[in-house]
Amino acid sequence: MEEKKVVRALSEHLSLPPPPSPSVAVAINGKKKSKYVVFWALEKFIPEGFTDFKLLYVRPPVSYIPTPMGIAVAVSELREDVVSAYKQELDWSANEMLRPYKKMFERRKVQVEVLLLDSLEPAAAIAEEIAGTGVTKLVIGMSLRGFFSRKIDMSSLIATAVPRFCTVYVISKGKLASVRPSESDASGSIRFERSSSTSGSTDSPRLPPEYQDFLSAVSEAQSRVSPFSPALKHSMGSNAVAQMDTSSSGTDQEEVSTGRGMEIVHSGIEGKKNKDESFSASFPMGTEAYNSMSWTSKWRDHEDRREMRSSSSSNNHDLVNMDWGAVVPENYSWVSHTASHMSDGLLSVHSITDNQVNLNFEIEKLRAELKHVQEMYAMAQTETVGASKKLTELNQRRFEESEKLVELKEKEEVAKDTASKEKQRYEEAMKEAEKVKELMMKEALHRREAEFKAERDAREKDKLQASLVSPGVQYQHYTWEEIAAATSDFAENLKIGIGAYGSVYKCNLHHTTGAVKVLHAGETQLSKQFDQELEILSKIRHPHLVLLLGACPERGCLVYEYMDNGSLDDRLMLVNDTPPIPWFERFRIALEVASALVFLHKSKPRPIIHRDLKPGNILLDHNFVSKLGDVGLSTMVNQDDVSSRTIFKQTSPVGTLCYIDPEYQRTGIISPKSDVYSLGVVILQLITAKPAIAITHMVEEAIGDDAEFMAILDKKAGSWPISDTRELAALGLCCTEMRRRDRPDLKDQIIPALERLRKVADKAQNLLSRTPSGPPSHFICPLLKGVMNEPCVAADGYTYDREAIEEWLRQKDTSPVTNLPLPNKNLIANYTLYSAIMEWKSNKR
């Protein structure tokens, strides 16, 4: 009764409804049968368009915490971190328990919010949550108990406590057991109906018309009896059907029928007497004495009074009544007391009339017929209950089997997906293994080819060493004393350059200005480079290769012709405030460098690869004629390897960073196209005058836009022709491709393109020349006083026409210029000057 008062007070407190919520609340207790409640809610409300659910779970608040010794300690006596950890453990356990229910919502692809409510009063907590959120649909499970149970009917308490704007659905074993409609659905009426699958009974069968008056009389008698409490309704066992309707006046009425020999008979005689007097007439001992009787005594007394009423036809007061206390055991005094009050109401009968005997006879007849109908109804009900139980079990089994089938299908899909991934991984592994196998075979083949080439190179090296000491090497031999005197004992003011392999000094040997390179002493590698450079420069001649005047092999000194304008790198970077090189001269320099590379690559008997081409190794004479120098890092390859194959070098890559072929850096394999890569970088520096670092990327980004492209060009070189300069830049980018096979051929593609650009530069240069100029002074022979036809260098260091100097030497042993004795009469052809003279003559024509 106390709980009922609390529920009623809470219901009145929560009577004002909040804004309605589109959610459906499902309250569970976490037991096995809770899944039927969730399943019913999903099947019911998802087709109606509800996609937002709230899962309510009420648990008692934490007031004590158990210890490992089994002692419960109050929360107030423990630290906050211990209490917090214990609560987190409880939250984790609750979430793990609710996980299967959340999966049921997730499989149906609907939103679910899990709410953990801490309260000692589940009905009050759920009602407060419904009132706060405005949920209009609540689904709960039925609280089942036996006839003699005193357990609280929690479903009834919840249905009573929940605000009136919410409809409550009570579920039992997956089926709807009862509904408490909201005020908007049923105008304030609340109706509980127990289905046959849960309570074992159905609604009373419809009686024939002749029994309607009888039932009306029974209802009138019951209206004077105080209604049962919800606890009494649910304690009446599986053979009771309780129906509660709330009328407009708010009065509760209950109709109860039983099939255990209990009968309700109301006489139709008009006139009423006091119920206490009626009960005293039927039981003179009094109400208190009757309530104190045992179950057996009450039943026997009930039978005696029934026989007395049947046999006494002259009695003024005949009432057939079933005593409610005879049904309930003596242990449940509160049920007996309530039943006695109902009996008191039923014993209030009307005044005795003259046709009392006939009415009693009719009542007995109706009682017999009603008993027969009830027996038939009980039999049908028993069969219905059995069938309903079987159907429920079958439905439950079908539901479990369907869940297992869904799980098996999910496992099957996961297994198929895993198998597919494993198969794909296996195929990829097999393909990778095949690739590795092919790479290993290619690597073995390359290794054998490299070993073969290494042996061949060793033989070629031996031949080269033998040829270095052969008499075929032609160069002027200088002593160490002569070189020291020519450089003023290597004075610092005469030093014009220094590198990784030696220093370069300006010298004057035999009245000839030259440049002597002195290699660092004591290094075997430098000795090899000296011998290689001496051999190459002493045997080959080209207008765009630096001319070797002589050497001192004992001290590692090489004497070159002196280049007045220094290196291309110094002129591009304007070192010492030197004037910039015009753009048309740069076009010509690119062609000259390319022609020198073609000459080296096509030399006989073996091609030569420079390997260290950069602006610092491109020297300029007083007419800006370019010549390649520093061939000490050059290497020779076999003639068969020039066009299609490369040579494998076992040493680490040599050269200057940013100019080295990327494939040569990565593999150590050198080829003529390694020089092509360096040439491409030099071309890009000619047009931009910028360092080699990232120059390829910079030109690639700007070449597509005229404004950006003009911005990266060297503006100090003059007015660049945009289309021709872009063509030269594109050629430089092609030369700097990462893969050798993507680079153009030097002779067949690069040289023709540069020759066409040189013609454009020559036309521009001729337009800038106002008056035709005469031959340069160094073209004039000191003997002939005219342009030389075949220039050559004599022992005094001056250049003469060959015919004129030979005629002079046949007659005299002195120099035509200095008039000093000549140390020898050897003549060295000056091919560089010869090429310049021929070019000047062709341009003049």
From Swiss-Prot:
EC number, UniProt record: 2.3.2.27, 2.7.11.-
Binding site for ATP: I496, G497, I498, G499, A500, Y501, G502, S503, V504, K517
Keywords: ATP-binding, Coiled coil, Kinase, Nucleotide-binding, Serine/threonine-protein kinase, Transferase, Ubl conjugation pathway
Listed pathway(s): Protein modification; protein ubiquitination
Coiled-coil portions: 351-468
Residue span(s) of domain Protein kinase: 490-754
Pfam family, one: Pkinase
Biased composition (Polar residues): 236-251
Any one GO biological process: protein ubiquitination
Catalyzed reactions: L-seryl-[protein] + ATP = O-phospho-L-seryl-[protein] + ADP + H(+); L-threonyl-[protein] + ATP = O-phospho-L-threonyl-[protein] + ADP + H(+); S-ubiquitinyl-[E2 ubiquitin-conjugating enzyme]-L-cysteine + [acceptor protein]-L-lysine = [E2 ubiquitin-conjugating enzyme]-L-cysteine + N(6)-ubiquitinyl-[acceptor protein]-L-lysine
Catalytic residues (positions): D612
Renumbered residue ranges of the record's region Disordered: 180-210, 229-258
Ranges annotated as biased composition (Low complexity): 187-204
Domain U-box: 774-845
GO MF terms held by the record: ATP binding; protein serine kinase activity; protein serine/threonine kinase activity; ubiquitin-protein transferase activity
CDD domains: RING-Ubox_WDSUB1-like, USP_STK_Ubox_N
Function statement: Functions as an E3 ubiquitin ligase.
Family indicated by similarity: Belongs to the protein kinase superfamily. Ser/Thr protein kinase family.
Record protein name field: U-box domain-containing protein 52
Gene from which the chain derives: PUB52
